[in-house]
């Protein structure tokens, strides 16, 4: 993929202009509402967001002390669907899946620390690494007393979810794989590489101009465009430099070399993938993904050749939004079959 300085100027200019629009529809008071709350929180969501995200998030103290917001919807049970998002999304990504499943299945959907409605500590106060993310999920599952979890993973949620699953295969039931990876790979889109640029350039793009979360609201769609409120929903938690700390952290945590701090963690996850061979799996893949393209889809087919797989050639990275009912219904049927 060729990428020129003109591309970067165009991209940054669009981001700068958008900062005055939907990208700056602020989180207004939500962070204050989460901090220090032990169970249900927050209450400060605006009406337009509650219409799309009609849930009452809960709050959990992670091992490093940062507060994690998470959804816990559906009947109380020690069996749950665990839905793990990636970057730059949050549990908002799973809103329609949760609404479909929650009448009969418990659904737990965390916002990773620094993302969504979770606390956003500085990089000095939280270790924004894959290992820390996995530890947070382990602690959340243990705190809820879950004895069996069915995984739904997307983007970074794949590495995090399979990190959990390969460490605790006895707890894992069915697995839904959505445009993700859980193994090292040297491929990286030029636009994401730009967001990792040294000398503070990458941070300026991601945190100063919202040049990762905002472009995703159009680059991650192909079949249709997100509505104005859907865009606002995705961007709601990331309204300023400080609130984009984890968006930048995830980009920098992509292990592109063996010397990277998270390479060993990801390689260990890859080695553990055979432990989950017998688990029923459903692969749902958007073929118009600028990041996790069909190379990754084919890798998953090689790793788990017995998995049920559906490829949607005209669907983008935000496969749940772009694929709509067609994708969501397949997830619902697959997971409800776990109930016998």
PLM feature spans:
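Arg/Gly-rich low-complexity intrinsically disordered repeat tracts
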Residues: 2-12, 20-21
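Short hydrophobic alpha-helical segments enriched in small aliphatic residues
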Residues: 25-26, 41
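Flexible "cap/lid" subdomain of the alpha/beta-hydrolase fold that forms the substrate-access gate
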Residues: 33-59, 66-68, 73-75, 80, ...
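Short amphipathic alpha-helix adjacent to the substrate-entry channel of hydrolases
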Residues: 93-107
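Catalytic histidine-centered segment of alpha/beta-hydrolase-like enzymes
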Residues: 315-328
């Amino acid at each position: 993929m060729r990428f020129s300085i003109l591309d970067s100027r165009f991209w940054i200019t669009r981001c700068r202009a958008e900062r005055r629009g939907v990208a700056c529809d602020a989180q207004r008071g939500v962070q204050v509402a989460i901090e220090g709350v032990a169970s249900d929180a927050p209450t400060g969501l605006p009406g337009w967001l509650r219409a799309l995200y009609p849930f009452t998030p809960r709050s959990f103290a992670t091992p490093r002390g940062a507060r994690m917001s998470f959804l816990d919807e559906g009947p109380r049970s020690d069996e749950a669907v665990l839905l793990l998002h990636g970057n730059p999304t949050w549990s908002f990504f799973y809103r329609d899946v949760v609404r479909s499943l929650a009448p009969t299945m418990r659904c737990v959907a965390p916002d990773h620390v620094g993302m969504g409605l979770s606390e956003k500590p500085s990089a000095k106060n939280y270790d924004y690494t894959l290992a820390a993310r996995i530890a947070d999920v382990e602690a959340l599952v243990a705190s809820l007393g879950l004895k069996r979890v069915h995984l739904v993973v997307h983007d970074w949620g794949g590495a995090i979810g399979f990190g959990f699953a390969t460490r605790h295969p006895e707890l894992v039931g069915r697995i839904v794989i959505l445009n993700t990876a859980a193994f090292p790979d040297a491929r990286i889109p030029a636009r994401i590489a730009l967001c990792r640029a040294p000398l503070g350039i990458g941070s300026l793009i991601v945190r100063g101009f919202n040049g990762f979360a905002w472009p995703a609201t159009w680059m991650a769609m192909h079949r249709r465009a997100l509505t104005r409120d859907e865009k606002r929903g995705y961007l709601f938690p990331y309204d300023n430099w400080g609130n984009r700390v984890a968006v930048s952290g995830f980009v920098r945590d992509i292990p592109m070399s063996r010397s990277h701090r998270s390479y060993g963690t990801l390689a260990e996850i890859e080695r553990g993938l055979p432990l989950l061979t017998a688990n029923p799996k459903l692969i749902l893949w958007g073929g118009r993904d600028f990041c996790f393209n069909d190379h990754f889809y084919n890798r998953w087919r090689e790793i788990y050749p017995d998995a049920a797989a559906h490829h949607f050639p005209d669907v983008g990275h935000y496969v749940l939004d772009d694929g709509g009912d067609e994708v969501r219904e397949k997830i619902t049927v697959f997971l409800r079959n776990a109930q016998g």
